[in-house]
Regions:
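Electrostatic, structured charged patches in enzyme active sites and in nucleic-acid/phosphate-binding
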Residues: 1-131
Length: 131
């Protein structure tokens, strides 16, 4: 029996990475950081922990008679974690490797919202390092 070409070109299902809490994480690094942040929340160091928070990247400006993409959503930035630490909101992203599109989205987010994104990296043996 011969199979047609489309039966061979089907992609294999990608396994979902789930943590011990049942939440689907994008990477093992993000899952480890999420577990660490949950421990910090239980200990009272941080509060209001949220995961995968989407921020629309839309420009709302008009210059005289010219409107530049007024109210049009161009893209969105998804922060890995958002939490409150010492009364301040912290927006955090876990990166093993930061590619150019993600760097650009972070820069656009920081310019539009006026908030700094904390990028965390996992270093073997030493824990988490802020970039």
């Amino acid at each position: 029996m011969t199979k047609s070409w489309h039966q061979y070109s089907k992609r294999a299902p990608v396994p979902q990475r789930t943590g011990p809490d049942g939440f689907v994480y994008d990477s093992a690094t993000e899952m480890r950081r999420g577990m660490d942040l949950q421990l910090l929340q239980r200990g009272g160091v941080i509060s209001d922990l949220q995961r995968q928070v989407k921020f629309p990247l839309e420009f709302k400006c008009s210059c005289g008679a010219i409107q530049v993409m007024a109210g049009k959503r161009i893209a969105h930035y998804t922060a890995d974690f958002v939490y409150t630490e010492k009364g301040r909101r912290v927006i955090e992203d876990c990166k093993g490797y930061a590619d150019e599109p993600s760097k650009l989205r972070i820069r656009v987010f920081e310019a539009l919202y006026g908030e700094k994104v904390v990028i965390m990296k996992k270093i073997r043996g030493t824990g988490w390092v802020r970039e």
